[in-house]
Amino acid sequence: MKAVCLLSGGMDSSTLAYVAKDMGYHIHALHLNYGQRTEKKELQSATAIARSLSAEEFIPLDLGYFKAFGKSSLTDPAIDVDVFDENRPELPNTYVPFRNANLLSIATSFAESRDADAIFIGVQALDYSGYPDCRPAFIQAFQQVMDLGTADGTHIDLLTPFIGLTKTDILRKGLDLGVPYEHTWSCYQNEEKACGVCGSCHFRQKAFAELGLSDPIPYEE
């Protein structure tokens, strides 16, 4: 069996690639640079994870148009990344408009070209509270798009094993599978030392703390 894994180099996508391999899939890893401010570190992390998995392929692609669009603190350096605030009612400014539809479209093209059986994307329970393109309904709808838009006789499963899990659940699973978390990167803001205050850092640190563990990546003091 073959699977395309969207691999950002973060905690969720890296763990998910290990899960896919554990399920018996041969991994074809796809890393997409959409202009995010930590891309250099993310690419380094994704490359290390793909190597540790002995992936069949690791393909990095550039999607520069997201940077041209702006509207997100991840792609526009003029917008400060939001500090995590669990009481913030509005969409966080780290939302990249309709990003996952773009990523999944490219992953579908790649999967169909490789006769792959599945695509894995690491959306999880905390994501779809803040990001509309991580909602279960969106994933279900995109599965229909894939079924309708690929060649007759083609079926590629869009798999989201983490959609009902918390970051702590994911970390626990990854530790069981031996994911090298020291090679992953989650921070939205920094590439040398994680900021510790963005939403991604917050949930990562919380997961390690809930399991009584120290996060192996460096953080600002």
Curated annotation (Swiss-Prot):
Top-tier EC class: ligase
Pfam entry (one): QueC
Source organism superkingdom: Archaea
Cofactor(s) needed by this chain: Zn(2+)
Annotated residues for binding of ATP: L7, S8, G9, G10, M11, D12, S13, S14, T15, L16, A17
Binding site for Zn(2+): C187, C195, C198, C201
Keyword line: ATP-binding, Ligase, Metal-binding, Nucleotide-binding, Zinc
One term of GO molecular function: ligase activity, forming carbon-nitrogen bonds
Pathway in which the depicted protein is active: Purine metabolism; 7-cyano-7-deazaguanine biosynthesis
Free-text comment on the cofactor: Binds 1 zinc ion per subunit.
Reactions catalysed, as given in the entry: 7-carboxy-7-deazaguanine + NH4(+) + ATP = 7-cyano-7-deazaguanine + ADP + phosphate + H2O + H(+)
EC number(s) on file: 6.3.4.20
Function: Catalyzes the ATP-dependent conversion of 7-carboxy-7-deazaguanine (CDG) to 7-cyano-7-deazaguanine (preQ(0)).
Similarity-based family: Belongs to the QueC family.
UniProt name for this protein: 7-cyano-7-deazaguanine synthase
UniProt lineage: Archaea, Methanobacteriati, Methanobacteriota, Stenosarchaea group, Methanomicrobia
